[in-house]
C-alpha cells in the first residue's frame, strides 16, 4: 500500500484508473471503517482510502484538537484489508490557502437534525468531500448509514453537481451489545460504556412501535426523549422521518407505508453519540 500526502502525487498514481472505489475517513479506524473498505472492494478496484481530520466540519466548541489521530495503527489495518493507496494529506496539503469557497447544502436538508445542533458541519463535510472527489476521481465511494444524514446529503450533492461517482451505502456495524461503532466511543467512561447501548435499544422500541401500528409519531419521539433523559442522557433530537428527504411524514404517507428512519443524537456524559434505524 502506498501512503501519499501530495494531491499531485495521488493524481499521478491513479492516472488511468477508471474503476477506483473510494472510502473517505478521519482515521482512528475501527471495524466499521474496515467493513467499508471490504464493501468498496466489491464495487471497484483499486480501493483508495483517505484519512484527514477536517477542521472545516468542527464547530468552535467541538473536539478537533483532541480527535484521536492513530495514523500508524490505521496504516496497518488498511494494509491488512488490501487498500491500494492511502491518501493522508496534511492540513497544508488540503488547504494551502484559506478555503474561501465552500459547498453549501440546502437548509431544508443541511440545517435540520445534525445541522441544527452543529451549524456549519455539513458545509464542511460537503466542501472536503467535493475536494477529495476531485483529487481521487473515483467511480464509486462508500459511506456508512450510521451517519445517515451525511450519506443522504453527499449522495444528493453528487447528483446535483453531476459528479461522476456512485455513492454506495454501507450498513452500520455494531458491537455485540448493539452500540454502533464510533471513533468517539473511546471517550466513554466504563459506566457510560455500559449505558451506551440504551440509545440503540430506545430506537429499536420506537421502530417496533411504528411497525406495530402506532401513528402518533410525536408521542413516540417524546417518550423516547424522556426515557433517555431519565437515565442521565441529554438528547439533542429523536426524530422519525421519511428516508427519502428526512422530512416528517404526513398521515397519508404513514398509511401508505412510506419508508421511514428514526434518528437520534444524545450526550452521555461528555460524549455525543448518534444512531439511527430504518423502519
From Swiss-Prot:
Active-site residue list: 33
Keywords from the named record: ATP-binding, Cytoplasm, Ligase, Nucleotide-binding, Pantothenate biosynthesis
Protein EC: 6.3.2.1
Disulphides: none
Domain of life: Bacteria
Binding site for beta-alanine: 57
Binding site for (R)-pantoate: 57, 150
Annotated positions binding ATP: 26-33, 144-147, 173, 181-184
Annotated catalysed reactions: (R)-pantoate + beta-alanine + ATP = (R)-pantothenate + AMP + diphosphate + H(+)
Protein name in the entry: Pantothenate synthetase
UniProt source species: Burkholderia cenocepacia (strain HI2424)
Origin organism lineage: Bacteria, Pseudomonadati, Pseudomonadota, Betaproteobacteria, Burkholderiales
Gene label: panC
Amino acid at each position: 500500500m502506498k501512503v501519499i500526502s501530495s494531491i499531485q502525487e495521488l493524481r499521478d498514481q491513479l492516472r488511468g484508473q477508471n474503476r477506483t472505489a473510494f472510502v473517505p475517513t478521519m482515521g482512528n479506524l475501527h471495524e466499521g471503517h474496515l467493513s467499508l473498505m471490504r464493501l468498496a472492494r466489491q464495487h471497484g478496484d483499486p480501493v483508495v482510502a483517505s484519512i484527514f481530520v477536517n477542521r472545516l466540519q468542527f464547530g468552535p466548541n467541538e473536539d478537533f484538537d483532541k480527535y484521536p489521530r492513530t495514523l500508524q495503527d490505521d496504516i496497518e489495518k488498511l494494509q491488512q484489508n488490501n487498500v491500494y493507496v492511502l491518501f493522508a494529506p496534511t492540513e497544508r496539503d488540503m488547504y494551502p490557502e484559506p478555503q474561501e469557497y465552500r459547498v453549501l447544502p440546502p437548509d431544508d436538508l443541511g440545517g435540520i437534525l445534525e445541522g441544527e445542533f452543529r451549524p456549519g458541519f455539513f458545509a464542511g463535510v460537503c466542501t472536503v468531500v467535493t475536494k477529495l472527489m476531485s483529487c481521487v476521481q473515483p467511480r464509486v465511494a462508500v459511506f456508512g448509514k450510521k451517519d445517515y444524514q451525511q450519506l443522504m446529503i453527499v449522495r444528493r450533492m453528487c447528483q446535483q453537481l453531476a459528479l461522476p461517482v456512485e455513492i454506495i451505502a454501507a450498513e452500520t456495524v455494531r458491537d455485540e451489545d448493539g452500540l454502533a461503532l464510533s471513533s468517539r466511543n473511546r471517550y466513554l467512561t466504563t459506566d457510560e460504556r455500559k449505558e451506551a447501548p440504551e440509545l440503540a435499544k430506545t430506537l429499536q422500541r420506537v421502530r417496533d412501535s411504528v411497525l406495530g401500528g402506532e401513528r402518533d409519531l410525536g408521542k413516540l419521539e417524546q417518550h423516547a426523549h424522556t426515557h433517555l433523559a431519565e437515565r442521565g442522557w441529554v438528547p439533542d433530537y429523536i426524530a422519525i422521518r421519511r428516508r427519502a428527504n428526512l422530512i416528517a411524514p404526513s398521515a397519508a404517507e404513514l398509511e401508505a407505508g412510506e419508508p421511514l428512519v428514526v434518528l437520534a443524537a444524545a450526550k452521555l456524559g461528555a460524549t455525543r453519540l448518534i444512531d439511527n434505524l430504518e423502519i
